Amino acid sequence: MSLSIGIVGLPNVGKSTLFNALTNNDILAANYPFATIEPNTGIVPVPDDRLQILADLYHAQKIIPATVTFVDIAGLVAGASKGEGLGNKFLHNIRECDAIVHVVRAFENSKILRHDEAPIDPKKDIDIINTELILADLQTLEKRLPQLQKEAKANPKARQKVEYLQSLIDNLQKGVPISALSDVDFEAISDLHLLTAKPVIYAFNVDEEGLNNSDLQSQLTELVSPAKTVFVCAKLEEELKGLSENDAKELLESYGVKETGLAKLIHAAYDTLGLQSYLTAGEKEVRAWTIHKGWTAPQAAGIIHSDFERGFIAAQIVDFNDLVAAGSEVKARENGKIRTEGKTYVMQPNDVVEFRFNV
């Protein structure tokens, strides 16, 4: 399964700079509003150190990591849902994304213009974007409702949906995003691609000092709790882009940082969406596959090919750490570390798998 993340934020918060760094891209990231006109898309590999280890173990010809697609749209402004600025035009480009990353400026720099030339105010900025997403969803629902009301005259199920959509409208009008509701019927609204129904990860763009400022991070985390937060320095991420792996690691360590912004964002997205990965390995290739936590072995097999799920017989599974400790698949089997699991087996994050199937 592929994972896609839409990046939103006000103009000049470092959104496009961060996107460039995450995707190793070189799109325009200018110091003025609406540097991003057309939506930009970048597909990036999910960092996973296990893949190279397995590739060395199996002498694999190639490595295929799991991937994430990032979509960067024009900066939103107050009134975007009514056509102000350029952002509203491109909101549809993130409607089918699995999650939203909201980039929030949390650094001072007089050389970089703020969208309204006011002092830095993360809470105000967050409220502006959230309001625009709510208003965009209201427009979607209010456009859909009249059509559904006509259907409801002859269809009892449609009447239930009318009542449900009206309840969503009532909550949105109170400023409550759909994701904050406890009893969301995602199946009923799946065709609407509502923005506030998507999980949101807040990426606070801080300066280098902010990466280790626990007081600042606590204050910012409290603003958006219980949503996931990550703290990135877009400027630093841009510097990392052209460095070798070792040089990048040294630069990160010099700032007391262990992970790149990309790794932080992807880990937060996996956690927020309840995702994990399993591995397949052989001489031809080593590969990571993204699945939902709690999926059974047949469901996981279906990600490779629908025939694998339909004709599932069993899964040969070894824990990654046990495999590495053994030094080879043959040794792992001799040590009794490779086991056979059936249709009810729930996949675990460190599983290295070979599926057996028959169609």
Where are each of the predicted segments found?
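C-terminal-of-GTPase-core extension/linker across diverse P-loop GTPases
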Residues: S2-V8, V13, F19, Q147-V346, ...
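Glycine-rich, flexible loop/turn motifs
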Residues: N25-P33, N40-G42, R50-I53, K82, ...
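Helix N-terminus capping/helix-initiation residues
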Residues: P47-D48, D121, S244, D319
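Conserved Switch II/interswitch segment of TRAFAC-class P-loop GTPases
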Residues: G42-P47, A74-E84, R95-K157, N171-V184, ...
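Generic signal for short, ordered secondary-structure residues
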Residues: S16, P33, T69, I120, ...
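Amphipathic alpha-helical transducer elements in NTP-driven molecular machines
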Residues: F34, D48-L51, I64-F70, E84-D98, ...
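Conserved G1/Walker A P-loop phosphate-binding module
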Residues: M1-E84, N88-R114, K123
